[in-house]
Amino acid sequence: MSLSRIMVTAVRNLHPVTLSPSPRINILHGANGSGKTSVLEAIHLLGLARSFRSTRLQPVIHYEQPACTVFGQVQLAEGGSSNLGISRDRQGELQIRIDGQNARSAAQLADLLPLQLINPDSFRLLEGAPKIRRQFLDWGVFHVEHRFLGAWQRLQKALRQRNSWLRHGTLDGASQAAWDRELCSASQEIDTYRRAYIQALKPVFERTLAELLQLEGLTLSYYRGWDKDRELSEVLASSLLRDQQLGHTQAGPQRADLRLRLAGHNAAEILSRGQQKLVVCALRIAQGHLVNEAKRGQCIYLVDDLPSELDEQHRQALCRLLEDLHCQVFITCVDHELLREGWHTDTPVAMFHVEHGRITQTQDHRE
């Protein structure tokens, strides 16, 4: 998959713009604050219906406009194209259109436009809360296992019912038992999908990381959210009193985590910020390879401030790994000269200069 056309209106400081990007490498360069990251944010909105820069809606919409809109034409892996559009207003109303029809959920966008983000906050995947790593894991499972979304929705519904009962005692014994059975069934299905995904991801991650960084002894493991030697139904029964005291369910897939350890310690406590970023890059590129295999198409990479915290050797290694995916990449940087030697001469590269929210396409820097 790739975006052949992008139209952006009223996203932060960007002037209304229509872009025709390269199906491979796109470099957006300009001074800090010029609007480069806002272009990536607009693409992120189109693919996930949310910003990666803010949980609040107001800062995303240009201060003089009532709503922001992003439109994209996607070239599909199987041939043909699909038109996607998203609009959000200041009241929070969201409109999603796919090929002229209203879409039911953002999951439909995500399925058509798989996006990977690598930015200066990427280290949070290692340092941050388990929720961030679950999101990473479930993004991958969603794109390779079509049954995952249904199981995840069943889990969320069962959890809401059980947690409501824990707080308010609104269910009778039979209803409580029924929801516990549904919770256990969905949990087991999700655990099966996640476990299979991690087994596929680990060798690809290890090979990818070896191209970027030599880290002997780094291990990636999966914790499913409850004792591996006990059934979830048994764990729920034994922790019922504690769950009632807390008002929520402590065990289950909603407590799962990915664990990266080095020399017996949490890797985030040992690795430098630059090393953490390379580990995260390897994880996200490995996910891209699995998407390629499962969907016979590529995800799109949004790479914000690529030179940040990486020396020339590692920048070039990362560029080569992205290039080997044969996917579409959008990269921002202040000085595009730092990326001059990153690509094969036959790889299509489009250059865009961003200044005060205006975007102009410039000549390929290798010509």
Curated annotation (Swiss-Prot):
Which residues form each disulfide bond in the chain?
Answer: none
Gene3D superfamilies per UniProt: P-loop containing nucleotide triphosphate hydrolases, RecF/RecN/SMC, N-terminal domain
| Annotated binding of ATP, by residue | 30-37
GO MF annotation: an example? single-stranded DNA binding
One Pfam match: SMC_N
Q: Where in the cell is it found?
A: Cytoplasm
State the Gene Ontology BP annotations.
Answer: DNA replication; DNA synthesis involved in DNA repair; double-strand break repair; SOS response
Keyword Cytoplasm present in the record's keywords: the answer is: yes
Main localization, broad class: cytoplasm
- Give GO cellular component annotations, separated by semicolons: cytoplasm
Concerning PANTHER family, the annotation shows: DNA REPLICATION AND REPAIR PROTEIN RECF
- According to its UniProt entry, what is the function of this protein? The RecF protein is involved in DNA metabolism; it is required for DNA replication and normal SOS inducibility. RecF binds preferentially to single-stranded, linear DNA. It also seems to bind ATP.
Family classification: Belongs to the RecF family.
What name is this protein filed under?
DNA replication and repair protein RecF
Organism from which the protein derives: Ectopseudomonas mendocina (strain ymp)
Q: What is the lineage of its organism?
A: Bacteria, Pseudomonadati, Pseudomonadota, Gammaproteobacteria, Pseudomonadales
Encoding gene per record = recF
